[in-house]
């Protein structure tokens, strides 16, 4: 029996396993549906290009047909191994915008506000470039570094952005977010530094930590409304793990998996559960609702040189050389995360913060890397950072081995369409600026024939895809309709919490891995200190005063 059963060894679950098992008196069980993270493609950064097709390491979900995207069902990759999506993502380290956390504070209290979040980000971070400062930490387990390799086209993109009157930003996690620049990544010595690598690998030998992989969670076990364990399927056999008296079940399966498991276990909207023959444990209608994601559209151009990372016979000598550089020195283009540069911009000058994000790739990327695009080219990803559209996760079946219903409801709010049109226009302006124009051969997609707003809208409906940031399906809040309270306890149930991206009340303006890790760090402290909501607010006030004092001291010393 265990004091804590953590379901899901992703970005959040690995942090929880580390922190909670640090107390040798507590027994911790970590369940993961996928295998151990031993595949070398996980740890070689450019291996990301081959991971989308791996059904072993990737849930490879499909959405429901999207009404506003010409009825298309979209591919939704999610990590299925130790480290979760942090083991298959592009490693971009972005915290989001300060205003995101002010909104969280409005929803869930000061312990989830900006001052507390910044404190945690700094505690977790081991930045390889920046010294310990107002914005960065150097003593944490999460390695954050500059890329060891940057393609000349990625540098040209940043220069072109400045030529298009966008400022250069040397630190997207610093004083301000706006601008173009190079992404810092979760890498160390040219290798991926996933949540598993950062928080789990170093504690595998702890005698009080049991890790069970290839264990597909099928049901949360309740006695009345108290969680007492978890059922899982491993090698077609059903197993159970139970908690001690007073022990807790911690759900960290992500914005898709957590609401799905709750509904399979009888927690959700009563009518939907009844429809699928699931016995009701607790009627909690908001489970699975409030789904938010970053919708993305690309500009793909052919290059007039062989500077990009290409798929061609002429690239073979460079590929062989790059392999040797990586194997023996951990250097070269195989250390690239592909999304080397990018930026944050406003769709219109009157906005008070960026609502568009760019990821520039010095290569062709077609269908999430699942289809090979031959030749030499480059791709600009453009995503709507602050979408207004909301979707849901639901049940398709009561069978735990069947995937859930995923309906992001993309572009259901017309403001999102307007934002993406603006993004295409700004993106084209950057790619037509002198530093990029000299590499330009022709626009492959959408093609130069697509010019008017109506033509751009139709292209968005035909081609837009996820950029992999689903959140919000077990919304945190102070209001009684929220799924979890500010201590992340599920309302109306006992001994069970949610700790992952599903608790975000609002999607952050940026990549979601770092914020999810921060959520887990905050949750671990709440759990270990046994804080209630009232104590949380008191602790947050103390943290705010301490943060303000620290910032004042830094300002004096600078």
From Swiss-Prot:
Top-rank taxon, per record: Bacteria
Intracellular or extracellular location(s): Cell inner membrane
Binding site for FAD: 3-32
Pfam families: GMC_oxred_C, GMC_oxred_N
EC number, UniProt record: 1.1.99.-
Keywords, sorted A to Z: Cell inner membrane, Cell membrane, FAD, Flavoprotein, Membrane, Oxidoreductase, Plasmid
Needed co-factor(s): FAD
Record: active site: 469 (proton acceptor)
The keyword Membrane appears for this protein: yes
One GO cellular component, as annotated: plasma membrane
Flavoprotein listed as a keyword: yes
Catalysed reactions, as listed in the record: a primary alcohol + A = an aldehyde + AH2
Main location: membrane
Single GO term (MF): flavin adenine dinucleotide binding
UniProt family annotation: Belongs to the GMC oxidoreductase family.
Function, as annotated: Converts aliphatic medium-chain-length alcohols into aldehydes. May be linked to the electron transfer chain.
Protein name: Alcohol dehydrogenase [acceptor]
Organism: Ectopseudomonas oleovorans
Name of the gene encoding the protein in the UniProt record: alkJ
């Amino acid at each position: 029996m265990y004091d804590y059963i953590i379901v899901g060894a992703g970005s959040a679950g690995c942090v929880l396993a580390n922190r909670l098992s640090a107390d040798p008196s507590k027994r911790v069980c970590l369940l993961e549906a996928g295998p151990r993270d031993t595949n070398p493609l996980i740890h070689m950064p450019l291996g990301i290009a081959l991971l989308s097709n791996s059904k072993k390491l990737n849930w490879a979900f499909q959405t429901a047909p999207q009404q506003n995207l010409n009825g298309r069902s979209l591919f939704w990759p999610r990590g299925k191994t130790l480290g979760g999506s942090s083991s298959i993502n592009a490693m971009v380290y972005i915290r989001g915008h300060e205003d995101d956390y002010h909104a969280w504070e409005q929803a869930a209290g000061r312990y989830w506000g900006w001052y507390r979040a910044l404190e945690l980000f700094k505690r977790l971070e081991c930045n390889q470039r920046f010294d310990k400062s107002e914005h960065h930490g150097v003593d944490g387990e999460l390695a954050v570094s500059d890329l060891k390799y940057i393609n000349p086209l990625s540098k040209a993109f940043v220069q072109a952005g400045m030529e298009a009157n966008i400022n250069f930003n040397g630190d997207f996690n610093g004083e301000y977010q706006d601008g173009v620049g190079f992404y810092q990544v979760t890498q160390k010595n040219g290798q991926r530094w996933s949540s598993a690598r950062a928080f789990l690998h170093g504690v595998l030998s702890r005698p009080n930590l049991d890790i069970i992989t290839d264990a597909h969670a099928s049901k949360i076990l309740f006695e009345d409304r108290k969680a007492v364990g978890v059922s899982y399927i491993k090698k077609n056999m059903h197993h159970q793990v139970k908690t001690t008296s007073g022990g807790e079940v911690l759900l960290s399966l992500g914005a898709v998996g957590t609401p799905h498991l709750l509904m399979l276990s009888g927690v959700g909207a009563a009518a939907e559960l009844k429809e699928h023959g699931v016995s009701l444990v607790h009627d909690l209608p908001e489970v699975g609702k409030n789904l938010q994601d970053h919708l993305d559209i690309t500009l793909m151009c052919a290059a007039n040189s062989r500077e990009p990372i290409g798929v061609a016979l002429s690239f073979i000598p460079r590929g062989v050389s790059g392999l040797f550089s990586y194997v023996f020195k951990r250097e070269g283009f195989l250390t690239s995360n592909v999304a080397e540069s990018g930026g944050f911009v406003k769709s219109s000058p009157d906005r008070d913060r960026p609502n568009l994000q760019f990821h520039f790739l010095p290569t062709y990327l077609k269908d999430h890397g699942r289809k090979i695009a031959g030749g030499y080219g480059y791709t600009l990803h453009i995503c709507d950072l602050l979408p207004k559209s909301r979707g849901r996760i639901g049940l398709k079946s009561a069978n735990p081995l069947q995937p859930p219903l995923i309906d992001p409801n993309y572009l259901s709010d017309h403001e999102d369409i307007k934002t993406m049109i603006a993004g295409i226009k700004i993106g084209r302006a950057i790619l037509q600026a002198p530093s990029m124009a000299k590499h330009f051969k022709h626009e492959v997609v959408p093609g130069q024939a697509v010019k008017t707003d109506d033509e751009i809208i139709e292209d968005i409906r035909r081609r837009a895809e996820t950029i992999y940031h689903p959140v919000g399906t077990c919304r945190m809040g102070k209001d009684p309709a929220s799924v979890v309270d500010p201590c992340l306890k599920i309302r109306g149930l006992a001994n069970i919490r949610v700790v992952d991206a599903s608790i975000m009340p609002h999607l952050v303006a940026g990549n979601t891995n770092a914020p999810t890790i921060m959520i887990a760090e905050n949750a671990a402290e709440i759990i270990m200190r046994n804080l209630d909501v009232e104590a949380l607010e008191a602790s947050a006030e103390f943290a705010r005063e301490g943060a303000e004092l620290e910032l004042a001291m830094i300002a004096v010393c600078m």
